[in-house]
Amino acid sequence: MSVTSWFLVSSSGTRHRLPREMIFVGREDCELMLRSRSVDKQHAVINYDSDKDEHRVKDLGSLNGTFINDVRIPDQKYITLKLNDNIRFGYDINTYVLEQIQHQVPEEALKYCDPPVIAFEQIPASSDKHEKYTSHLQMCSKTSAVREDQFKEQGAHMDSSQAKQEKVDKKSATDVPAYRTPLYGQPSWWGEDDDNKLGKEGRSQDEHYSERPKDMTQHEEEVSDNMGYRDSPDQCMYPFRREPSYFEIPTKDFQQPVKPPETQVYEIPTKDTDTVPPVTPPVMQSHASFTIEFDDCKPGKIKIKDHVTKPSMRQRKTAGKEPGPTEMVSAESKVADWLVHNDPSLIRRPSPGEDVYSTKSDLPIHNRTLKGNKHEDGTQSDSEDPLVTKPEQETGTADHPQHQRQFNREPEELLHSQQAFVIEFFDDDAPRKKRSQSFTHNSNSPPNDTDPILKAKVDKRKGTVHVEKVSTNGTGSTAPASKSLSSPSFPQRSNSFRREKTEDRIASTPITARLPGKNYGSVGKKSKLAQEFAAEYMHEQAEVVKQAAEKPMTLPLSASILQQPASQVQISSQVQAMPVTSDVRSETIKNEEEDNLSDAGTYTIETETQDREVEQARKMIDQVFGVFEPDEYSKISSTVYRPVINKGKEEHLGSEPSMTHKPIMSLSTPPIKLSNGLQAEPLIERPGSSSKSGQKWVSRWASLADSYPDASPTSPSDSQKQGFIADDEDVIERIEVQGEADPTVPSRTRRLLPQLPPENVMPTIFVCQESFSAESQRKHVEEPEKGISAENSSLLLVQEELDPDSLSDTSRSDDGVLSVRKSAKASKIYRNGWKGEEPHSRESSVQRTLVSSSEKKSTCFYVGNDDMGSLKQTTSGLSSKDVVKNHESHINLKANVHSNVETPSAERLVNQFHKKENGSAKDPLSFVRQESFTKEKSSSNVSPNKLPHISTHPLLKDLSVTKSSHDYSQETRLILKETETALAALEAKLFTQSHLDELENTPSLRDDSLSGESDVDTASTVSLVSDKNAPIHSQQNRIVNLQKEKSSSTSSIQEQYCQSSARERLSEKRRTVPADAGTRSITKRVGMTRSTGARGSLDFTDEERSSSLPYMPVSETVSSDYENSSSRHISRRKPIGQTCKEDSSRSSNAQKVQQALTRSNSLSTPRPTRASKLRRARLGESSDNECADGERSNISPGTSSANSSSAKSSTEPKKPSRLDILAMPRKRAGSFNVPSDSETYSSVKAMFSGRSVDQTYTSRKPAVAESKQPPKKPVAPTQKQTPSKARSSSVKYSSSSTTQTSRSSSVSRHHKSSRQDEDEVEQEVYNNFMAQSVEIAEIARLSQTLVKDVASLAREIHDVAGDGDSQSSSGTGQSTSISSVPNTPASTISAREETIKRPLQRTRPLQLVHHIPEASLNYQKIPPGSTGLEDFDQNMNDSREDPSKRRARNIEEVIFDNLMLNPVSQLSHTICSDTEVLTEKMKVLFQNTEKNWEEIEAKINSENEVPILKTSNKEISSILKELRRVQKQLEVINAIIDRSGNPEDTASNKKTSSTLLTSNALPRTTNNSAARTQSQTPGHLRNYIHKSSSSSSRSPGSSFSRDDEETYIV
C-alpha cells in the first residue's frame, strides 16, 4: 500500500518528516530544532489537519517571525502549507521546502507496524552554531512494540515476530517519506531511499534482533515509555510534548503516520513487547545519534537512560528482561511525553493500568467503566474488545477477553486518559499489553479504535507466541501477552494507575482481568499492600472459584487468564492458578516496586510484570481507597461508580465503564460484560467470588484505612457472596456493591469527601444515616420525585454513607452490609427496585448531594450506606419494614452516637421531613434553601426536593423514614414545630441579646453552614417567598425549614450555650410523641441546635422555652411561627393566641420568652442570618439581651411615641456606643440578624405590650422585627392573626431582607387579611401620631437649637453619618434582616411608625417611607429587628420598602404629621443644605488643613455619636438626622476654624451640643448613617433633602444607607 509522507527539506538537503500531529519548531525542546539564534526557543508549531490531510504552521509569536515564501505569516494563526512552499523560521539561513513523498509499504508491514516512526535529521546547511540538530529522531515505538511482542513471542513466535518487525521496518522505511520516521534502529530514516533501505535493513535487523528482541524491545519500550512516560503527565495533557526536546520529531508523528492504525497498534505492542528487538538495534543506533540514548535499549538491555528505563524495567520483569539504565528511560519517556502531548488521543489511550499519571484523572473510573460497558464518553470497550479479541483469538482464545478488555480500556484511555503513553489498553486480564500498546498507541492515537484492536491483536499474538514459548495454554499466552504489555515502562505507569481502576472493574469482571488490573492499579504505591491483599484475595478468590465450581468452564478460562499474566507457567486449576498467580504477582510486584520507585512514581512504573495477586491486591486497594478512581472518579462521580457497585459489583467490575458511567442502568448487564467473552454466569460467578473476596478484602482494608472495622460488612459481604452465588447476577452484583466495589467506591468516596465537603460531605452525612429501610420508605414517600434520578438514587443510596470520613468509615463497613442487606432483601431491588428504593434513599442522598448522575455523589452516598449498611446488614433478610424498624433503632443509637455530628443534619432532616409531609412541591424550595447551607449545587439531576435530603443528616433521614413508616408525620411535625418554636424563641432571645454584637459582627457568615449561598436571602427571602407565594401550610413547612436552617446556623451556639436545654426541651416534647417521632425530633433538635449556631435560639432558657412553648401548641407553634411572624409583621393588634400567651406570661421574662418565641417562631421561619448567628455566638444571650435592653431603652423614646401602646421604654439610649457599633453598616449589612436585636428589643418591650407580632413582619427578619415591634403594639395572640397575615408577614419578612416593596405588598395583604389589626394599628397610629407630634415639637426645638449650633456643628457629618447612620441604614436598608435593622431608636421609630402606617400604606406609605429613608440614615444603627426600625431604617434606606413599612396610620394622622413635620422638615433641610454648603466652603478654605479636618471630623463623629430618640415617625427621624448632621458639620467647622484645630475642643463643643439635644429630648441617631449621608456631597444631601421634604421622607439618608447597606451586604 502506498503511504504519503510530508517532509520539510532544508536548503542543506536535510529531510525532516512531518508527523501527522503537532510538532514544535524552535531552538529548544522542539521536535524540529533549529540552531539559528534568530529562532525562538519555541518558534512555531506545525500541525497536521487529518481532515484535510494538510500541514499547517503557526507562528508562536516569535520575535523574528515565520516566513512562507518570504512572506511573514501572522502570529498565532495557522497557515496551511502547500506543496513546495518555502518556509523560513526567523532569519535562519536554512529554508525548508514542503515536499510530499509516497512510499509503497507492504500490507504486512502496515499490519504489524505502528505508524511510521518520524525521524528528523537536520544537517546544518551553513554552520553548526546555527543548526545543531540531533542527527536523528526516530520513534520506533510502534516497531519497538512489535519487536517487543516478537520478543515476548520468542520461541515459537520468534520468527513471526522477526517477520513482523521486518515488516515494521519496511513500513517504517516506506513510511519515512510518508510521514513516519523509521522506527528506532532503522538504518535510513530520512528519505524515501532511506525508507526503502530501512525496510530492507529493518527486516534484516528484525531478523538480526529477533534473536535479541529484549534489547530492541527494551529500547523501544524505553522510547515508548518516553513517549508515553508518565513523567510529564501535564505534558501529556498538552497537544505536544516539549519535554522530548531530545526528539526532533514528536512521538505522535508515529501516531499520525499515513499507515493504518493497525500498524500503529502493532507498533505499540511492539514497543511494549520486547519482541520487536530486530528494529531496536537500529533504533538504538538512531538514538545514539539522538539526544535520547536508545543504544542501551536493546531487548535484553534497555539502555534508554530516560524515564522509560523504569517502565522498561517493568517490561523486563514481564519479559524476564532487566531494563537498561534508567537514564535511557528519560530520553524515551520524553519522546513518549511529547507524543502524548502532541496527541491528545494518545494521552487518553493509556490503558487503565497505565493510569499512573491519571491517579487524579478520570482514567481509573474510565478503566473500570471500560471493563464491561460503554464508557461515559460513549466508547464501548467491550464492543471494542470483541473486535480485538477476534483478531487475537488467532493467537489464543484466552487472550480474547484480555485484549477485549484492553481495548475497552483503550478507547476509554484514549478518550479519557490524558496520559500520553498508555496507548495499549490492557484488558483487565492483560493490562500489561495495553500498557505496552499505550505508548505507541498514543502515537497512533488518531486511529484510536483501529489501533487498539490492532495492538490488542499484536499483543495477543505476541502474548500467545510468548505463552507458547512458555509452553502454556491460552491462559499462559494471555499471561505473556500481559507481560509483554507490561514490558513498556511508560505505559506501565499509566497502566499501573489505570490498572488500579481497570483492576477494580476487572475485579468484578473475570478474575483474570481483575488481577492484571489490580496489579496495575495497586502496584506502585500499594505494592506491598497489594501483594498482601493480592495473596489474600487470590486465596479468597480460589475459594470463590471453588464455590463457583458450577461454572468451572468459564472460571477456568478467567483463572487461566489471570494465571498467565501472573506467571508464564499455566496453572490448570483455577484455585491453584490464583494462589500461584498471587505469588508470582507478589514477586513481580516486588520487582516492579523497585522499579516503581521511579520519578513516574510507584504506580507509574508498575506494569504488566506484576503478579496477578499483586494486580488484584492493587485493584482491591484501589477499590478500597478509591484513590485512583477518585481523580478520574471526579469526572465520573463516585456516585455513578458507587451505584454500580451497589447494584452489582459484577456490573461495576465486569462492565467497569458502564458501571462508572451508568452504574445503575448496567446493573442487569454487568455479568455478561464481566465475562467479556466468557460466559456471563461463570464470569459473574467468578467476578462474584472475586468480588466477594475482593469486597471482603476491600471492606477490611477500607475499615482499616478509615479506622473502622470492615469485618462485619466484609463477612456479610462474603457470606452473601457465597450465599448468593446461586443467585449469581444479583448476588454478585450485590456482593460487588457491598463488599468490594462498594468499599472501593466508599474509600474513594471518603477520600473524595474531604475534597467535596462543601457539596457532598454534608449531604452525604445526612443521607448516610438513613437506613436501607429508611431509603425504601423514603422511596415510597418520595419515589415519584426520585424517579428522576433513580439511577442516581441507587448510587446515592450508597453514597449517602460517605458524608464524613468517620461516618464514611462506619458506613463503609456498614455499607457492605447495607448492600448485602439490600441484596438479601431483594437482588431485584438493586436491579429493578434499586432505582425504586435507592432513589428514595437517594432522594435524600442524591437530592441532598445533588449527585443524581454525578458519580461524585457516590462518595456521599457511601456514607449514607454506612449506617444504612449496618442496619441493612442486620436486616438483610428482613422486610423493608423490619429494616425500617432496625434502622429506627439504629437511628436511635445513631442519634446518641452521632448527635453532635448530626445536629445540623438532623435539623435538615426535620426540614425535609416536614417538607415531605407538606409535599414535594415545597420540598424543592426548602431543600434548595437548605442546599444553600449544603452549597449543594442543585445538581441537574437532583430536584430541589432532593437537595434537602442531601443536607439532611442521616439521622434526620432516618427520622424521616421512621416517620413515614410509623406515621409520625403529624406528631413529628408537631414536635418539630414545637422544637422550631423553642429554637425560634431561643434564637429570638439570643438574637435580641446579641443583636447589637451581631450587628457589629455582621461579617460573620456562619450561616454559610446553613446556606453558603444565602447570607440574608435564604433565611428571609426564602421564607418570605414561600410564605408569600405558597399556602400557609407550605409556608409552615418552609418555616420549619427556615427555622431549621436558622437553628442549624445557630445550633452550634445553641449547643454551646443551651444545646442541652434545647435538646432536652425538644426531647421532652418529643417524649410525648412516639419513639420514632421522638427520634426525629431528637435529630431535629440536635440539628437545629447545631444549625442555630449563631442564631441565638439557644439563648432561650429551658424555662423560657417551656414558658413560651406551652403557650403555643406545637401545631400552633409551627404555623404560628410563620403566622405570628407574619401577623406580627403585618399588624400590631394582638392575635388572640398571642394575647393569651402574653397574659399567661406577663412576667417580663415570660413575656420576653413568649415574644421571643413568637418572634423566634417567625424568626425561625427565616433562619438566622450569618451575621446574627455570629453575633450571637460572640455575644451570647446576655449580649443580645443587653443589646435588646439598650436598644429597648434607646428605641423606647422613639418607640414611646412610635409604640404608643407599648410602655415606651426609657427614651434615653442605654448603649449608644454599642448600638453604633452594631449599626456599623458592614456588620449590619453583613448580619441580617441585626433586626433580631431590635426585634429582641421589641420582644422585651412586648413584655409590656404584646405587640411584637407585627413588628416582626416589618423587620427584615420577622422574628427580629417582631422583637422590636411588639413594644409598639401590644402583642396580639399569634393564633389570632390570620394565616394570610402570617403569609404577608413572611412576605414582608422576605421583602424586608429584599425590599420594602415586598412589605408593602405584605402590608396590603395584612391590611386585607385583618381589619381588626388595622383598627388596632389605627389606634397605635394615633398614639404614635401623638408621640410623633411630641417628637415633632422636639424636633422643632432641636432645629432651632441646631440652627444656633450650625456654626459649631461641623463637617464630621461625613464620617459620622457614613459610619453610624449609613451603617444602620445599610443594616436596615434592603436587607432588613434582624441583624441588618439597626438597634438604634431610629430603627424602632421607623418600625413603629411603619407598623402603624402599614394598613394605610397604600395611601401614603410612599411619602412616609421616603421620609423614613432619610431618617433611616440616622437610624441605620437601629436594630433591624424591630418592625418599626425596619420600616424606618429601610424606608430611609429603601423607598421601595417604605410603602409596606409605612405604618397603616390613619390618613388623618399621617396628614397631620406631615403638616406638622413639613415645616420642620423644610427647615431642617434648609439648615442641612446651608450647613453642607458652608462645610464645603470651609473645606475649600481649609484645604491645607484637610488632614486636620478629616481627623477632627472623625473624632467628632466618634465622640458625637448620640443615638437619636427612636421615633415611629420617619420624617421626624429624618429631620433629627439632618439636624444632627448639621450639628456635626458645624462642630467640625468650628474645630477647623479654631486656630488650634484642636479636635478635642470641637468634640467638647459637640458633646455640649449633643447634651443640649439630649436635654431637649432630641432623638439622636446612634447610627452614623446620617453623618455619612451628610458626608456625601452637599448636592446629594440637598437633593435627598428636597426629595424627602416633598415626600416627607428623608431619602438622602435612605439612599446613602441603602448604598452602605448594599455595600456591606456584598
From Swiss-Prot:
CDD domains: FHA_Cep170B
Comp. bias intervals (Polar residues): 437-448, 470-495, 712-722, 1017-1040, 1048-1061, 1116-1128, 1146-1167, 1381-1390, 1562-1578
Alphabetized Gene3D superfamilies for the sequence: 2.60.200.20
Cytoplasm in keyword set: yes
Positions of the UniProt region annotated as Disordered: 148-237, 304-523, 648-730, 737-756, 774-853, 931-951, 1001-1240, 1253-1321, 1361-1404, 1419-1445, 1540-1610
Domain of life of the source: Eukaryota
Family: Belongs to the CEP170 family.
Organism per entry: Xenopus laevis (African clawed frog)
UniProt keyword annotation of Plastid present: no
Locations listed in the record: Cytoplasm, Cytoskeleton
Name of the protein described by the UniProt record: Centrosomal protein of 170 kDa protein B
Main location: cytoplasm
Keywords: Cytoplasm, Cytoskeleton, Microtubule
Domain FHA: 23-73
Role noted for this protein: Plays a role in microtubule organization.
Pfam families (alphabetical): CEP170_C (PF15308), FHA (PF00498)
GO CC annotations, alphabetized: cytoplasm; microtubule
Comp. bias (Basic and acidic residues): 164-173, 196-221, 452-469, 497-506, 776-788, 834-845, 1062-1073
Listed Low complexity bias regions: 1193-1210, 1287-1307, 1363-1380, 1549-1561, 1588-1600
PANTHER family: CENTROSOMAL PROTEIN OF 170 KDA, CENTROSOMAL PROTEIN OF 170 KDA PROTEIN B
